[in-house]
């Protein structure tokens, strides 16, 4: 009987299916650690951390402050929680931004590399046998945002730092321009594609007016074509996401031209791309990419940050978060996402970190899985008047930082339009429908 089941399992795996009751595959997503090595408790709250830029740290404690980037103790607590969570994961994705938010003169190339090295060694010490797929963030360079289109000291340094995780082909393209792809060990026909979307980021002056910086679009198309031919599935990871900012009107996370190109490519290869995973925003958000006819074809997940930092002018921020995805090991369909968080106020009061489950996406929202159709149906529920589902979503957007937070009509329209519309034409139409506004 066991032999027959094993044979059936093997046959189903070849067909991209899994046996009922087979354990789900799992991977962790961590992002935006933003270590501030200067963080320390002192009576002068303007001097607690360089990342507060002289502002008074509001309530500094052992695990940090909302006006500061992450102290090392907070980052250690996150990885310690993951290590002792009891969740057996086959890999981790780490989507960038290790250095703190400080003025350019306070850092250097050496300082940036040192912080990335520190975080790399920290991860390796907690998880010596875990496969990790890293990607670079806009702060993982000096000066920040200015990631180049050719070999650089930082690209070389991270390739050396990440040798234990990446194969020679991946390291070669990483050295050239900060992107790579690699198959996932133990997961037949699953490939990670790590994009350097910092090349498309508005503040990056290096790539201004370039149609295909570092030939990354050409490389991405070739990589996805090859995966299609080889019947692979792809998990796409990057730092800066595609789509529109959910708290702004008509602003894309990357330059609009690059966003349109990326969206077109991701539509064309939606049968290959089984999921997209981003950081950068420090908030917890979803997006659903639809094809030209409005059919949902791709699920996107923006993970909240480990750092709790906010700008002195902002009212809200995020509690620190890390997340775990579950997937079908046969066809790489995403089954669920478990978001974990640390209540920073509580941790500082008690002097100990108690990371806990914030929510399971399927259980909280009553959806069957994380496929595009499921998330599209959920987004439709969000859009209904007085949606209790959306109230939950908006609280989770800030990782349960402030349950009294209210999203008014315009705020909600911007959120809904950003979740469901990733290209200019559909986003503009959504704003027109909800707010009577059209954007260029």
Name the predicted role of every residue range.
Residues 71-136:
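Long, well-ordered early-domain segments
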Residues 202-217, 225-278:
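Active-site-proximal segments of metal-dependent phosphoesterases and phosphodiesterases across multiple
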Residues 1-15, 19:
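Classical eukaryotic N-terminal signal peptides for Sec-dependent ER targeting/secretion
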Residues 96-121, 141-159, 246-251, 286-292:
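Metal-dependent catalytic neighborhoods of phosphoester/phosphodiester hydrolases
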Residues 19-94, 154-230, 283-440:
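Metal-dependent phosphoesterase/phosphodiesterase active-site architecture
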Residues 36-39, 100-103, 134-145, 201-203, ...:
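Active-site environment of divalent metal-dependent phosphoester hydrolases
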Residues 112-126, 153-172, 259-267:
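Acidic, His- and aromatic-enriched active-site or binding-groove loops in soluble protein domains
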Residues 29-31, 90-97, 128-137, 235-239, ...:
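Active-site neighborhood of phospho(di)ester-bond hydrolases with catalytic His/Asp-centered motifs
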């Amino acid at each position: 009987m066991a032999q027959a089941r094993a044979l059936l399992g093997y046959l189903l795996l070849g067909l991209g299916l899994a046996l009922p009751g087979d354990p789900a595959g799992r991977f962790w997503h961590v992002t935006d650690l933003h270590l501030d090595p200067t963080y320390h408790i002192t009576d002068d709250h303007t001097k607690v951390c360089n990342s507060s830029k002289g502002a008074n740290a509001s309530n500094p404690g052992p695990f940090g402050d909302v006006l500061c980037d992450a102290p090392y103790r907070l980052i250690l607590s996150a990885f310690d929680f993951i290590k002792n969570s009891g969740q057996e994961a086959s890999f981790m994705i780490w989507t960038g931004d290790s250095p703190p938010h400080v003025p350019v003169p306070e850092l250097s190339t050496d300082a940036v590399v040192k912080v990335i090295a520190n975080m790399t060694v920290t991860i390796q010490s907690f998880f010596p046998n875990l496969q990790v797929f890293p990607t670079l963030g806009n702060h993982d360079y000096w000066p920040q945002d200015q990631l180049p289109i050719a070999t650089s000291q930082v690209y070389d340094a991270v390739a050396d730092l990440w040798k234990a995780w990446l194969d020679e082909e991946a390291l070669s393209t990483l050295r050239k321009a900060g992107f790579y792809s690699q198959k996932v060990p133990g997961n037949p026909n699953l490939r990670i594609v790590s994009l350097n979307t910092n090349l498309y980021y508005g503040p990056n002056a290096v790539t201004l007016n370039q149609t295909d910086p570092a030939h990354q679009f050409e490389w991405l198309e070739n990589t996805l074509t090859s995966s299609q031919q080889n019947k692979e599935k792809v998990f796409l990871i990057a730092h800066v996401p595609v789509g529109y900012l959910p708290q702004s009107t008509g602003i894309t996370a990357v330059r609009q031209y690059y966003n349109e190109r990326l969206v077109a490519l991701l539509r064309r290869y939606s049968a290959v791309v089984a999921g997209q995973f981003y950081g950068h925003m420090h908030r917890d958000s979803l997006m659903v990419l639809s094809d030209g006819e409005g059919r949902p074809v791709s699920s996107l997940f923006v993970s909240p940050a480990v750092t709790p930092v906010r700008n002195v002018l902002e009212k809200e921020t995020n509690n620190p978060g890390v997340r775990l995805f579950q997937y079908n090991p046969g066809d790489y369909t995403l089954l669920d996402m478990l978001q974990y968080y640390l209540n920073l106020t509580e941790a500082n009061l008690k002097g100990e970190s108690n990371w806990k489950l914030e929510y399971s996406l399927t259980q909280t929202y009553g959806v069957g899985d994380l496929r595009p159709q499921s998330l599209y149906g959920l987004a439709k529920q969000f859009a209904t008047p007085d949606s209790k589902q959306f109230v939950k979503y908006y609280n989770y957007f800030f990782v349960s930082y402030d349950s009294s937070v209210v999203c008014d009509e315009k705020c909600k329209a911007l959120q809904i339009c950003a979740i469901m519309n990733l290209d200019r034409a559909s986003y503009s139409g959504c704003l027109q429908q909800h707010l009577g506004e059209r954007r260029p």
